[in-house]
Regions:
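Short beta-strand edge/turn micro-motifs at domain boundaries
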Residues: 2-5, 11-12, 29-33, 126-128, ...
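Soluble non-cytosolic domains of exported or imported proteins
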Residues: 34, 38, 60-63, 85-95, ...
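Sec-exported extracytoplasmic/periplasmic mature domains
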Residues: 45, 49-53, 74-78, 99, ...
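Surface-exposed, charged secondary-structure patches
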Residues: 93-139
């Protein structure tokens, strides 16, 4: 009988240790996933901030923002934005497009809202968010554009980057 108690006691202790280990693993995995989601949301918000442009922005500030935008994307990346931009972009093409954007736009306020991220694999994620552009072109007219955006993200060298963006019209 005492051997049975010892064995039963050992089994209970081992079972508790296994359950505690599994719980710690799940807790750690959940924390890492939340940390990745927060990092991706910060990436999207930072991209919107760096696409924002004021009339009085210095050249140095503009160059820093252009570099930050390019750094937010994987190389190559895919863009599907109506008539404005479509296809695969390497870093050089992306930088050239950013230069054209900044040359055409007098001022712009860009924002991202309702950012939802799903980690699909250890180094891959999908997301959706609403993007809003309110700006004035140097040629005069202003516009407000609101789009739903589907995004794919990849983690390279320990950092999340945008792999693709697909813009769709928002129904009013």
């Amino acid at each position: 009988m005492s051997k049975m108690r010892i064995n039963l006691g050992q089994i209970i202790v081992i079972t508790m240790l296994v359950l505690a280990g599994a719980g710690a693993f799940l807790f750690g995995y959940t924390l890492e996933e939340r940390r990745d989601e927060a990092e991706i949301k910060s990436l999207v918000s930072g991209l919107a901030d760096n696409l924002t442009q004021t009339e009085t922005e210095s050249t140095a500030s503009a160059l820093i923002k252009v570099k930050a935008v390019a750094d937010a994307f994987a190389d190559p990346m895919t863009l599907a934005m109506d008539k404005y931009a479509f296809g695969d972009y390497d870093r050089d093409r992306l930088l050239a497009s950013m230069g054209r954007y900044r040359a055409l736009v007098k001022s712009a306020k860009v924002s991202a809202s309702d950012i939802r991220i799903t980690i699909t694999e250890k180094e891959k994620a999908n997301g959706t968010f609403a993007g809003r552009f309110e700006g004035t072109l140097k040629s005069g007219p202003g516009d407000v554009i609101i789009k739903d955006i589907d995004a794919e993200f990849v983690k390279t060298e320990g950092r999340w980057k945008i792999k693709s963006l697909k813009f769709t019209n928002v129904l009013h």
